[in-house]
Amino acid sequence: MSISTFNRCWSKVILETLVRHNVKHVCIAPGSRSTPLTLEAVRLQERGEVRCHTHFDERGLGFLALGMAKSTNSPVAVIVTSGTAAANLYPAIIEARQSGEKLIVLTADRPAELLECGANQAILQENMFASYPVATVNLPKPGQNYAAKWLISTLDQACHSQLVEKGVVHINVPFAEPLYEANVTEIDEHVWLGPVRRWLGQHKKWTEYQEPQLEVLMHEHWDDWRTKRGVIVAGKLPQGHGMGLKLWAETMGWVLLTDVQSGVEPTLPYADIWLANKTVREKLLQADLVVQLGAHFVSKRINQFLSDFKGEFWVVDESPKRLDPYHHIQTRFNAKAHLWLRAHPPLRQKPWLLEAMALSNFCSSFIEQQVGGSLNEASLAHHIERAFPKNAALFLGNSLFVRLVDALTKRTENYPIYTNRGASGIDGLIATAVGVGIGANQAVAAVVGDMSALYDLNSLALLKKVTQPFVLFVINNNGGAIFDMLPVEAEAKNAYYRLPHNLGFAEAASVFDLKYARPYTWADLGSVLKQAYMRKEATVIEIKAGPNDATNLYKRLLEQISFAVIGA
């Protein structure tokens, strides 16, 4: 039995284990050392067990997998070769860890005898991602002295850890040469597979764990707490977990503050703006109880409110992680938001903070007036629902635009919104959005800034792989406009923060053979979008904006609302 054939046997067992842990997508970067894993993934695709996706850039590949994990709510496998190919996955691994997405990263490696001796493309890959994975498996060089049952049970345990805590599993897989010309018949009939052949013929995990029966119990003093003044703050929630929250809050008469990532229609929209009003904010801080559902809030004003609040504080989330950066004394419920609501029946009461309702209503007309009717960065954020059809998903990039949407949009439709707000980097956003679309098999509108687009320019190649309508908005305000919010001297801000580039994206779209448009009015945009969503391919739409237009509007809104006097 050749080394190359046994490398394939070893890889077969690895990938068969992952498939039984609900892996349906495998993202592969080209490389020689990962050949045994790649070719076994291809065999699984030929049997209809998985879909294989490729990209030449490992950093983008990691984010592509991340997007698929988001929209499928299932683990996605990534295969890369040894060396810096593996290191390029680090940003996506960090984001997956911070946002609780399930990736299974397979890094091919040189065997131990080739490490630290001057061998080519050999780096120290064991535990290279430090504490970011929820489980790390450093496999030995394939050898028949290791039972197939041991390999399966080891990987099975690692994959199970993702059910306990969502995140990344890193499996480092060293292979000795030769890597090619394996005998496929010998792979499947190898005696080493004998003890697990029956398992290979079934589609079941090696270990069937019984799910813990965690009933969500009502707080013992809920009958008392529900009569008091409360605030519900909804952060990033999984799709559907905010179901019924708006009605629940309205019944209770409690103030509901919602993040754009919550999937919940706000009862008091534009909270990021009206919370700038000192009078209303101080009255809100008089609440007896704050219940936080989810985490990772975009709004600076909501975060400031949470930081300043001194009363009773409850946190509800299915993750065991700490989700309170302000370190309140708190009651913690490990539960899904909608199940917690079901366990805590509301008591019908009148709203206790009428000033917030009045100010929110005032903001509606005031923001409309200030934004105006022209097509620009702020108006696109305010009217973001005009940018995509009802059957599409929305992906919001980081930096300024996601803040504008959070502040200026009155969400009325229940459509999925995806973000990378775990570490909130501007890297890999295009790749993540493509992954969302491929995983969900639905149309996507993605909005990123110009700096984000430049950072992830390689991922424009991935737009050729979409099979549903995909619209990539690039908001080009000639640099990092978010930094206009910083109290830094103008010349230094421009030279060291904003970094104006004076570039456009028509040529970039042309290089990657993508359709491109630059609309100047809402009528132009409507015509472009009508055509774009009729095509099962990608369209790049560049929205040119003044460097300071959106930030000046944002600052002006906050300043004027802060002094507003609103009668209840």
From Swiss-Prot:
Pfam families: TPP_enzyme_C, TPP_enzyme_M_2, TPP_enzyme_N. Catalyzes the thiamine diphosphate-dependent decarboxylation of 2-oxoglutarate and the subsequent addition of the resulting succinic semialdehyde-thiamine pyrophosphate anion to isochorismate to yield 2-succinyl-5-enolpyruvyl-6-hydroxy-3-cyclohexene-1-carboxylate (SEPHCHC). This is 2-succinyl-5-enolpyruvyl-6-hydroxy-3-cyclohexene-1-carboxylate synthase. HAMAP family: MenD (MF_01659). Binds 1 thiamine pyrophosphate per subunit. Its EC number is 2.2.1.9. It catalyses: isochorismate + 2-oxoglutarate + H(+) = 5-enolpyruvoyl-6-hydroxy-2-succinyl-cyclohex-3-ene-1-carboxylate + CO2. Homodimer. Pathway: Quinol/quinone metabolism; 1,4-dihydroxy-2-naphthoate biosynthesis; 1,4-dihydroxy-2-naphthoate from chorismate: step 2/7; Quinol/quinone metabolism; menaquinone biosynthesis. GO terms for biological process: menaquinone biosynthetic process. Keywords: Magnesium, Manganese, Menaquinone biosynthesis, Metal-binding, Thiamine pyrophosphate, Transferase. The keyword Aminoacyl-tRNA synthetase does not apply. GO terms for molecular function: 2-succinyl-5-enolpyruvyl-6-hydroxy-3-cyclohexene-1-carboxylic-acid synthase activity; magnesium ion binding; manganese ion binding; thiamine pyrophosphate binding. Belongs to the TPP enzyme family. MenD subfamily. Its cofactor is Mg(2+); Mn(2+); thiamine diphosphate. The keyword Electron transport does not apply. InterPro entries: MenaQ_synth_MenD, MenD_middle, THDP-binding, Thiamin_PyroP_enz_TPP-bd_dom, TPP_enzyme_TPP-bd.
